[in-house]
């Protein structure tokens, strides 16, 4: 595979692929994140037949993105990529409503991928009133490494796209990361990370330490986030479809399932 060193190369490949009609895709470029991947020698590309692949290398697996001419071409060209690149564990996210996503899932299943988990988007119209929440603070840069440590320890990297330390610091800098602190020095009982635009609030990560669950920490963090997004029109997040406790909590706040799903699939290439 070819190393991607600058964002401009990614842009060029996307334009070329679109012009060639490679419109079957799970690749939605994010300049801010991908500039970092290029800088860290973690982003690669390879053209196989009628599919342009992009690969993000991580310590124990690789995330695969594609732009292909058809579902059939994707399955065929994936076999070529896997054969050429030896051993490894590959993760693919397939995002969309069922009518768009299901043919892709069927194609990837036919070439050896298996489903790890399914996430579904929930949303609600932003309420007119937002409750304030006591004990919740904006995170500081001194919290960044501890938050990264908690994410690495309690989230599943293959399924939940754990952010880098640099991304965490960015959210802290724009005041999109709230924490509740524990009694011990430098301890954090919970945090919530979110993206905010004039139109929408998007929950990215919500965590409550196992030792304090059931004590209202999670609810106060959510209320603080909702208050921060009180001028938006809609509020969204993704939830694992088997996480019944979280779904029950979100429905309590008026969220309902939307058609968009993210099916995470894995492929282990062992030669």
Please give the residue ranges for each predicted region:
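Cytosolic beta-strand hydrophobic patch enriched in CBS
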Residues: 44-46, 177-183, 237-238
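N-terminal charged segments
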Residues: 1-80
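A conserved beta-strand-loop-helix scaffold within acyl/acetyltransferase catalytic domains
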Residues: 56-60, 163-184, 188-208
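Conserved hydrophobic beta-strand within the GNAT/NAT acetyltransferase core sheet
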Residues: 92-93, 203, 236-241
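Acyl-donor-binding surface of acyltransferase catalytic domains
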Residues: 68-133, 263-269
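Conserved acetyl-CoA-binding loop-helix of GNAT-fold acetyltransferases
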Residues: 71-84, 208, 214-227, 248, ...
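Conserved active-site alpha-helix within GNAT-family acetyltransferase domains
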Residues: 98-115, 219, 242-260
